[in-house]
Amino acid sequence: MNFDKPINRLNTHSAKWDMMKPLYGVDPEKGTSMWVADMDFEPPVAVSDALKTMADQGVYGYYGNDGDYRNAICGWMDRRHGWNVNPAHIFTTHGLVNGTALCVQTFTEPGDGVVLFTPVYHAFARVISAANRRVVECKLAQNDGRYEMDFDAYDAQMDGSEKMVILCSPHNPGGRVWTVDELKQVAAFAQRHDLILVSDEIHHDLTFGAKHTAMPLAAPEITDRLVMMTASTKTFNI
């Protein structure tokens, strides 16, 4: 990707820029759009070339099973994160929010509590409420300008009606890259309260200074209650 070549996306039906005025009353010519995780750079040439190849086929029918796709994911996770993924364990959804909704609907019932470490990506609460589940806010503490988790306080909040916990790792919007010890504490929290753990790791390739650890590597003992979600969208701006 060429980070020295920003693209002017005004009047291209870009939600990031063309929706600034109607949503927030801010002239995009005068403001800086920071309300959505969407980069103003072209994706890698390999991505563009692959899309062009598919478009040039001229027929856009239903897409079938693609082993190369799963193998590419496995290779990336192995090279970048040291995680050996079983391709049979990969389930494709129409985006991370859709994947979250499917998890909520599959593993919980109406009225159940779903734990969020807040503040966090706003779509999680929307998905939970839309499914007639309850948002259980476990508030992150601020310590020297960074968010931290207080599991003594969170344990005291639980009443047994909670069935799921959603973690954002790395954290959105705080930017925290959780340590291995913190991830282990989240896993132990899920075990103590018999919760399905959904780990949103969509920003796993975009960290600065700290190293991201995939939850299955940090706490392999909870893989039977873990759903890890990620995507190529943030990494490659697609």
Walk through the language-model features, giving the residues of each.
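A secondary-structure boundary/capping signal
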Residues: 35-37, 117, 231-232
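Short glycine-rich anion-binding loops that position phosphate/pyrophosphate groups of nucleotides
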Residues: 37-39, 169-173, 234
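Active-site PLP attachment segment
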Residues: 218-238
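N-terminal small-domain helix-loop-helix segment of the aminotransferase-like
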Residues: 2-95, 102
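Residue-level marker for buried hydrophobic side chains located in beta-strands
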Residues: 169, 197-198
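Conserved core of the PLP fold type I
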Residues: 60-188, 205-220, 227
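Walker B catalytic acidic pair
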Residues: 201
